[in-house]
C-alpha cells in the first residue's frame, strides 16, 4: 500500500469512528442529500445497461452506502466493494447483506475476475497533505487500474477548478484538462457531467459507444 492510500485509510477510519455510517462518516459533511446525489451520479454509469444484475466494483466503498442506495432505487447489482479502512469494511460486511466486501487497496489487490462496471466515489476529491503533482500521478494510476478491471465502463468524481474558493485538503482538477487526458490516455468513449450543484464533476468512460 502506497503512502497516499495509507493516509486515506487513516483519515477515513477516524471519520467513521467519530460519525459512523453517515455522510459525515465518509467526510461529506452533514447534508445527506449531497451524498445521495453523488450515489445517483455513480449509478448513472449503468444507465445504458441492458443485461440484468450487472457486476459493479465500488472502489473506496466505505460502509457500503452505494449498495444500500441502489436497492432503494430498484437497481439490481452484483455488487462488490473494496476499501482500505478496516472499520468501514467490517461494518459493511456485517450490515449490508446484498453486497460482497473486501479489505484491500485496489491498486495492488489481485482480483480473480473482471467487473462490468467500476466506480470510485470520493477518493479523487481528497488529497489531504499530498502534493498536487503526486496526487495527479495517483489519480492517473487509479483511473487506469479501474478501466483495466472493467468490461463496460467506469465512473469517478473530482473537485472542479471552476470555483471561487479552494480547500487545501481537497483535490481539484481542471475539467477540460481531465477530459482531454482521459480522451487521449484511456478511452474515446467519454462523458463529463458538470451540471449538478456540487463543486465537482463526474466522468464516465466506456470501452465501446453507448
What are these regions (language model features)?
Residues 57, 65-102:
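Class I SAM-dependent methyltransferase SAM/SAH-binding core
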Residues 33-52:
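Conserved alpha-helix/loop element of class I SAM-dependent methyltransferases that forms part
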Residues 166-210:
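Class I S-adenosyl-L-methionine
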Residues 1-23:
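N-terminal, positively charged/glycine-rich alpha-helical extensions of SAM-dependent methyltransferases
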Residues 150-158:
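Conserved beta-strand signature within the Rossmann-like core of class I S-adenosyl-L-methionine
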Residues 117-133:
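A short SAM/SAH-binding and catalytic strip from SAM-dependent methyltransferases
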